[in-house]
Amino acid sequence: MLIIELLKAIFFGIIEGITEWLPVSSTGHLILVQEFIRLNQDKAFIEMFNIVIQLGAIIAVMLIYFERLNPFQPGKTAREVQLTWQLWLKVVIACIPSILIAVPLDNWFEAHFYFMVPIAIALIVYGIAFIWIEKQNAQQEPAVTDLARMSYKTAFFIGCFQVLSIVPGTSRSGATILGAIILGTSRTVAADFTFFLAIPTMFGYSGLKAVKFFLDGHHLDFAQVLILLVASLTAFVVSLLAIRFLTHYVKKHDFTIFGKYRIVLGSLLLIYSFFKFVF
């Protein structure tokens, strides 16, 4: 029944809206949830769906930060316009590693790592990394506390960290936030740049998935279009809340709690995978 499929779409949109911005892996969570709750659709659509619904989350970022990211915003001084263009240049530079590395390898990683065990391992490994890095940085003052002071070189290396998220379970936001902190930025700068970098990255990735879907000879029927729209709209609404939560959270807290969550979830998934294999 279509109504059941739409309810599932709403649920997946909620998962996407929350996990896209928290450093816990949205694609990984969607793949895991679909182990238990699946859309009654073909595999090609589901694989495309998992990526394309990110567009709703991206539009939420664009809405929240529209004035900050718009160089043509009325009332901006010449200096503010210059800084906005510089920010966009940093974002473009940070996209280069993904274009050169992640895009060509995407199909290979999709074929070999989109399974529960690799996702569980990635959750645990990056969970440990979050805890360890936060512990190492506890007594250190960040060198970069303002995006305007972040160098183009730092932006490029943050983009290199983003490439790590090609492995499901890693988390794009988690990889870039970790990388930014390692490179000396404050948590606030790390989170903000992660949000901004998501715009071209996820628009591009979603576009590639959609184009590949159609080039492979697939098409969308009315029900599938509706499922995509409902899931994306839900992801948009939930993302508005998740982004505001994270921007306030990082001002007073570190990311240790997310590291612990990743380790617990990854461990449970390994146990589940073991029993599923045995029994």
Swiss-Prot record:
It catalyses: di-trans,octa-cis-undecaprenyl diphosphate + H2O = di-trans,octa-cis-undecaprenyl phosphate + phosphate + H(+). It is a multi-pass membrane protein. Bacitracin is thought to be involved in the inhibition of peptidoglycan synthesis by sequestering undecaprenyl diphosphate, thereby reducing the pool of lipid carrier available. Keywords: Antibiotic resistance, Cell membrane, Cell shape, Cell wall biogenesis/degradation, Hydrolase, Membrane, Peptidoglycan synthesis, Transmembrane, Transmembrane helix. The chain crosses the membrane at residues 2-22, 44-64, 85-105, 113-133, 163-183, 188-208, 223-243, 255-275. It is found in: Cell membrane. GO terms for cellular component: plasma membrane. InterPro entries: UppP (IPR003824). One of its GO terms (molecular function) is undecaprenyl-diphosphatase activity. Its EC number is 3.6.1.27. The gene is uppP. Pfam families: BacA. Catalyzes the dephosphorylation of undecaprenyl diphosphate (UPP). Confers resistance to bacitracin. One of its GO terms (biological process) is peptidoglycan biosynthetic process. It comes from the Bacteria. Belongs to the UppP family. The keyword Transmembrane applies. This is Undecaprenyl-diphosphatase.
